[in-house]
Design a protein with these regions (language model features):
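Short histidine/acidic/glycine/proline-rich micro-motifs that form metal-
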Residues: 37-38, 171-175
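A recognition module on extended beta-rich or small alphabeta surfaces enriched in W/G with H and D/E
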Residues: 19, 160-161
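The AdoMet/dcAdoMet-binding core of the Class I SAM-like
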Residues: 48, 52-159, 175, 179, ...
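Class I S-adenosyl-L-methionine
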Residues: 5-6, 12-15, 173-209
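Conserved SAM-binding loop and adjacent beta-strand
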Residues: 35-50
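Conserved beta-strand signature within the Rossmann-like core of class I S-adenosyl-L-methionine
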Residues: 163-170
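N-terminal auxiliary segments of SAM/dcSAM-dependent transferases
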Residues: 1-29
Length: 209
């Protein structure tokens, strides 16, 4: 029996660098990058609180898009709250997908290993829309600048169904607070409603048209 954390697997990714699969008594099995949990563990609990809040709005979710699928924590919860939904996941790092399948039970998702920006542009061209879009696009603790551009946010809004909801996950500690709040101001100019929700050290920005 392990008393603290046990490293189940370590791999080197050309995108995320060193990725560890960790098992702990407190948080179960999770995927960590640079000491920051990416999938499973506390991340699962953060998204559970967030999606529970969204589920209370009684929105109809037939199609869900997860940008930044990671190891699949969020996709499990989507199935829990909207069992009849069809989920599409986009993840740029195939290593995360592989570990998710091996250790976190990632399944029942249409997986696209590609850049989220390109996927959204492709969805726009084919006129696809989603009822729930989850944007969780960190590489470690870095949020790629291109996903803060107005052009990307406009594209997200266009592929969101009329009564749909999109939630952006931002880290919310130290200097990350200012970054998150600046991003929130951009969203407020593009969406009719932006709700601020704070589970743990994160800011979830829940937006609707």
């Amino acid at each position: 029996m392990f008393l603290t954390n046990k490293i189940l697997k370590t791999i080197d990714s050309p995108i995320n660098g060193k990725i560890e699969v960790v098992k702990s008594l407190a948080f179960g099995t999770y995927i960590s990058i640079g000491g920051l949990t990416q999938s499973g563990g506390i991340v699962y609990e953060i998204w559970k609180k967030t999606l529970k809040r969204i589920a209370r709005k009684n929105i109809l979710v037939n199609k869900c898009l997860i940008l930044g699928l990671g190891g699949g924590s969020v996709s499990k919860l989507v199935k829990q709250y909207w069992p009849d939904s069809y989920t599409t996941g986009v993840e740029i790092d195939k290593s995360m997908v592989k570990l998710g399948k091996e250790y976190l039970g990632l399944k029942d998702v249409e997986i696209n290993v590609m850049d989220a920006y390109k996927f959204c542009m492709r969805s726009l061209k084919s006129k696809k829309q989603y009822d729930l879009i989850i944007v969780d696009l960190y590489i470690g603790d870095k949020y790629p600048e291109k996903f803060e551009y107005v052009e990307f946010i406009r594209t997200i809004k266009k592929i969101l169904s009329k009564k749909g909801i999109v939630v952006f996950n931002r880290l919310y500690y130290d200097r990350k607070r200012k970054e998150a709040l600046n991003f929130a101001k951009i969203l407020e100019k593009k969406f009719e409603d932006v709700e601020y929700f704070h589970p743990e050290a994160n800011l979830m920005l829940i937006c609707s048209k």
